[in-house]
């Protein structure tokens, strides 16, 4: 009998060890912001921790599931580090959707857990200003089709014509002080001063303003938040009045799905669509839009930034392209252009890097691998993919309802018509 009793732990122990290993894998992917891997792991383990279920829901634009799941976890008073991360994600979800008061509530809840959190303390003055405005809302037509002007969208902002770039790498829409006044917007200064950082890590001072109305075709958004920067800021300083701005992630997400073509047609479509989580190849990492691209045999996450004129690869990419770097890489000093000015970085120049992105092969020719990490996203992601890569396609679709990126070349479009 005692021998049989001693045998019981031998049967149970591997099962317990397997469960611990599974949780360890999920935690590793979560800590490394690897949402595509975490999604795939959860599909194999449907009874996993609610925290990871909620995290994946947040990342793949399932806001209701994200919030409901996290509220269940918060109700049992999790560890402070877990509670902080949930409030951080919930604040990002709210800000992406233009729910300003809810974003402030989550920031304040985070600061109750950790009053010294520098990111929350830094972003609170901005969000506090926005919380006094009604939430962003969308109305009007479900679809719009417009002709772009050299990549800029024809808009009406508070009834006045504007022509703005669209920038998936911008946490919030941004415009110059002169354009804000042109549109009759009241500029407010956050307490303690507003400071943000551009793609190069340069500090940029800003005010805050909210447009009562922003119209694209027949689609109207109300209460759209803008950061307001000085008239001397790049790239606005050399632009004409009415063109000194860009449309950021909360507006683009509200469009539902957006498609643009090489001949300048831009379409937005808010119609309902059925999503398939396993097929999603874009996700959110807080206020970053992330896409998965393949290099050789590696599936890698990158920041997707339609506002970047040129793509840059980050230090992590050098690790997976080690052979290519050794064979054909040369040293260079590479200039990165940001709103706060130009900055030079030590980099490795490669003649060509081919990525499979959104179902199509596209080449960075040449490719620049920065040797130093510019911002926190460089810890988790392999580069910043810009419009130079996307414009190699005949048409591009970013669909926030299905969380997919699709690139089509001329052959693909002809085949679709057939």
Segments and roles (model prediction):
Residues 19-418:
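Pepsin/retropepsin-fold aspartyl endopeptidases
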Residues 1-4:
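N-terminal secretory signal peptides that target proteins for export/translocation
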Residues 7-16:
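Bacterial N-terminal signal peptides
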């Amino acid at each position: 009998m005692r021998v049989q009793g001693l045998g019981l732990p031998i049967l149970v122990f591997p099962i317990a060890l397997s469960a611990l290993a599974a949780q360890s894998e999920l935690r590793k992917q979560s800590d490394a912001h690897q949402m595509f891997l975490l999604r795939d792991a959860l599909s194999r383990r449907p009874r996993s921790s609610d925290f990871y279920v909620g995290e994946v829901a947040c990342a793949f634009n399932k806001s209701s599931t994200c919030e409901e799941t996290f509220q269940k976890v918060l109700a049992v008073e999790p560890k402070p580090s877990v509670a902080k991360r949930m409030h951080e994600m919930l604040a990002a979800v709210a800000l992406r959707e233009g729910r300003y008061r809810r974003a402030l509530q989550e920031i304040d809840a985070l600061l109750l857990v950790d009053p010294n959190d520098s990111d929350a303390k830094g972003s609170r003055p901005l969000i506090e200003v926005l919380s006094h405005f009604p939430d962003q809302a969308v109305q009007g037509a479900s679809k719009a089709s417009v002709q772009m002007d050299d990549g800029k969208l024809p808009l009406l902002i508070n009834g006045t014509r504007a022509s703005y770039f669209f920038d998936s790498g911008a946490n919030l829409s941004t415009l110059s002080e002169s354009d804000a006044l042109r549109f009759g917007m009241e500029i407010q200064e956050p307490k303690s001063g507003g400071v943000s950082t551009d793609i190069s890590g340069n500090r940029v001072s800003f005010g805050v303003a909210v447009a009562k109305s922003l119209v694209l075709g027949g689609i109207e958004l109300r209460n759209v938040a803008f950061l307001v920067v000085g008239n001397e800021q790049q790239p606005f300083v050399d632009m004409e009045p009415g063109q000194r701005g860009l449309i950021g992630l909360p507006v683009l997400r509200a469009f539902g799905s957006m498609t643009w073509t090489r001949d300048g047609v831009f379409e937005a479509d808010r119609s309902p669509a059925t999503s398939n989580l396993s097929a999603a190849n874009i996700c959110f990492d807080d206020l970053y839009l992330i896409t998965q691209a393949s290099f050789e045999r590696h599936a890698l996450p990158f920041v997707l930034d339609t506002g970047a004129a040129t793509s840059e690869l980050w230090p992590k990419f050098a690790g997976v392209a080690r052979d290519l770097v050794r064979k054909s890489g040369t040293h260079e000093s590479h200039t990165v252009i940001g709103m706060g000015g130009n900055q030079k970085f030590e980099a490795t120049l490669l003649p060509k890097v081919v990525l499979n992105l959104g179902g199509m092969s596209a080449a960075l020719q040449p490719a620049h691998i920065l040797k130093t990490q510019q911002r926190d996203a460089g810890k988790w992601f392999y580069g910043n993919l810009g419009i130079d890569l996307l414009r190699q396609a005949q048409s591009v679709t970013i669909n926030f309802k299905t969380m997919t990126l699709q690139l089509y070349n001329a052959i693909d479009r002809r085949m679709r018509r057939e």
